[in-house]
Regions:
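Catalytic cores of the polymerase beta-like nucleotidyltransferase superfamily
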Residues: 1-315
């Protein structure tokens, strides 16, 4: 007798013809009622205080969360309290972006109170309600806007972008590890340049480079010319800072040491001139190792390709 809907990113992905990474369910049932409904299955009280129970069905974990309304956000990251609700609308109105604020059930069909489906058609990331309020509640949402725009190749709505730019300083409320996680997903997107161009001020603030990053505009155009490799993409983005600057930025973001090492080595050796002679190649391999040499040459080739494209466009 309880309502239940799949909700959020999985609905967005289904509408876009993408394969969802996971499925989230929202329900009118309280956590203990969810556990009763699935008494014969494995349940995990993942975040029962905030209404979430994970149910494992056929080996697949499903997060089931009670409809809820958020209290005040005094730390600019998480609500101080949540209250359970019996209304789906209370749950949808607290979500970050319209494309993530849709719900679906076989009985009722699609519930789209904020024109999320239209924003998918418009290829737009837009906040639910007042953007300034959404970002004031949770500063991580600013980076999520850039990430979704990059991953989905969407534009950021004008009012949403203006609020994001005006609240750039609030990125300091977000843990460095979370900043890296969001930026890393954006860096690995197939078409990241448009989002990184629109969100430039926020990205530089997140990297703690408010005075700028040399060759930023060229760097973001170079990223999609590289394989889907985090170290190489970061090397393209941060090459203007040099190896030392890249190391400082990535260390501050608590990036994995493996990424920091490869990124900095690629930047440091990208200008190395290795002549196409067996002896010279073997010498470089002996000095740098296969991975480092390959990374450096791959980065240099992508940067040269972009430089050539830019020169032809300007001619």
């Amino acid at each position: 007798g309880y309502e239940a809907y799949i909700v959020g990113g999985c609905v967005r992905d289904e509408l876009m013809g993408r394969t969802p990474g996971d499925y989230d369910i929202t329900t009118s049932a309280l956590p203990e009622q969810v556990e009763q409904c699935f008494a014969g299955e494995r349940t995990i009280p993942t975040g029962i205080k905030h209404g979430t129970v994970t149910v494992v069905l056929d080996g697949m974990p499903l997060e089931i969360t009670t409809y809820r309304a958020d209290g005040e956000y005094t730390d600019h990251r998480r609500p101080d309290s949540v209250s359970f609700s019996t209304k789906l609308g209370d749950d949808l109105c607290r979500r970050d972006f319209t494309i993530n604020a849709m719900a679906f059930s076989p009985r009722r069909g699609l519930v789209d109170m904020y024109e999320g489906r239209q924003d998918i058609a418009r290829r737009t990331v837009r906040c639910v309600g007042e953007p300034d309020r959404r970002f004031d509640e949770d500063a991580l949402r600013m980076l999520r806007a850039v990430r979704f725009a990059a991953v989905l190749d969407f534009d950021i709505d004008r009012d949403t972008l203006n609020a994001l730019i005006n609240r750039t300083g609030d990125i300091s409320y977000v843990a460095r590890e979370r900043v890296f996680a969001e930026l890393n997903k954006a860096v690995l997107a197939h078409h990241p340049q448009k989002a990184f161009r629109a969100g430039k001020r926020l990205v530089l603030a997140a990297l703690e480079m408010p005075d700028g990053l040399p060759n930023y505009d060229d760097a973001i155009e170079t990223m999609p010319l590289l394989p889907d490799d985090a170290a190489l993409r970061w090397a393209a983005l941060l090459s203007g800072a040099g190896a030392d600057g890249a190391k400082a930025a990535l260390t501050e973001l608590r990036a994995p040491n493996s990424i920091i090492g490869r990124t900095c080595a690629a930047i440091a050796n990208r200008t190395r001139n290795v002549k196409p002679e067996r002896e010279k190649v073997l010498e470089a391999l002996s000095e740098l190792g296969e991975e480092c040499l390959t990374d450096a040459l791959t980065l240099a080739a992508a940067q040269a390709t972009h430089a050539g494209d830019a020169a032809r466009a300007a001619a």
